[in-house]
């Protein structure tokens, strides 16, 4: 759905599914001995602690209907377009950006999209 047509309920549902997907991916990786990334969720904020001490923060921004990502490589803002989070600057999809940032910080290929 276009960003302009998103209701508060739609935003909260999509944001919750997105954070839950990230957490489920981290749990799957831990169980499969892929990588141990600790996560801590406080409301709409999810903090990932990667090996080596670096962090990635994913934060919901309900008033703006955005999802923000802060990583070593920079800060990114995402808006939902047709049900997919897209970077407001270059249009990159959220999970693709998260995967590239996490891979760079972890020193190994990680894919959050599946």
Identify what each model region corresponds to.
Residues 2-114:
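N-terminal intrinsically disordered, cationic/polar leader segments
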């Amino acid at each position: 759905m276009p960003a302009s047509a998103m209701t508060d309920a739609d935003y909260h549902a999509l944001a919750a599914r997105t954070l839950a997907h990230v957490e489920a991916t981290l749990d799957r990786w831990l169980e499969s001995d892929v990588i141990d990334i600790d996560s801590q969720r406080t409301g709409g904020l999810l903090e990932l602690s990667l090996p080596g001490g670096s962090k990635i923060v994913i934060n919901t921004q309900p008033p703006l209907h955005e999802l923000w990502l802060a990583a070593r490589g920079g800060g990114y803002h995402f808006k939902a377009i047709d049900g997919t989070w897209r970077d407001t600057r270059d249009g990159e999809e959220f999970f693709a950006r998260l995967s590239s940032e996490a891979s760079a910080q972890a020193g190994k290929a990680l894919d959050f999209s599946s």
